[in-house]
Amino acid sequence: MHELTIYHFMSDKLNLYSDIGNIIALRQRAKKRNIKVNVVEINETEGITFDECDIFFIGGGSDREQALATKELSKIKTPLKEAIEDGMPGLTICGGYQFLGKKYITPDGTELEGLGILDFYTESKTNRLTGDIVIESDTFGTIVGFENHGGRTYHDFGTLGHVTFGYGNNDEDKKEGIHYKNLLGTYLHGPILPKNYEITDYLLEKACERKGIPFEPKEIDNEAEIQAKQVLIDRANRQKKSR
């Protein structure tokens, strides 16, 4: 049996919206393809390398927890950036997405330094962008989830897709997330992967390609995931009509 290793960073601080469900989805989806997933929880980064890592995951947290996580992850920002540039798949949620950028501006105007992995920034406001969200993606098809964030993120990189219902990165450009090489960043909770198996398969497939192990096409029953996604799409459509 082939194996993949996931590094789950700052799991003790960044799991505000049960984002651990994304790890469970990756593990279960891989199991259906006879791939064993080993999850390494990393809360202290001193001396950490990415030599044994195939996928990394960073969840979301409060502003306070995010600041603590940023400080800890800054110790490995150079190898993290190198891994991303080398094509390592990664999924970052909300705060985990925000602090990959250069800065985070609080509602009172205070600028907090990010990891600076990529050239973008986030500005937080007191009113939050909350509710169901539906996205149309050239790569993943229809994506659904739930968003709840005060941050407005701005960048010129590729995105997960176009927002057809909800807000996304901000309340202006109708774009959601970031898609840079094999790095995915998003504001979608839910968690995102159980309802969007296409993204789960993407991360696993890219990890297998990079490691040189087969990711063979296999008939998998996706009916439960499809039905769950349709429930959110239908609910969003009803909300559209009532506005």
From Swiss-Prot:
UniProt protein name: Lipid II isoglutaminyl synthase (glutamine-hydrolyzing) subunit GatD
Gene Ontology molecular function: carbon-nitrogen ligase activity on lipid II; glutaminase activity
Family: Belongs to the CobB/CobQ family. GatD subfamily.
Source species of the chain: Staphylococcus aureus (strain COL)
Domain spans labelled GATase cobBQ-type: 6-197
Residue positions of the active site: C94, H189
Binding site for substrate: R128
EC number: 6.3.5.13, 3.5.1.2
InterPro entries: Class_I_gatase-like, CobQ_GATase1, GATase_3, Lipid_II_synth_GatD
Subunit structure comment from the entry: Forms a heterodimer with MurT.
Keyword field: Cell shape, Cell wall biogenesis/degradation, Glutamine amidotransferase, Hydrolase, Ligase, Peptidoglycan synthesis
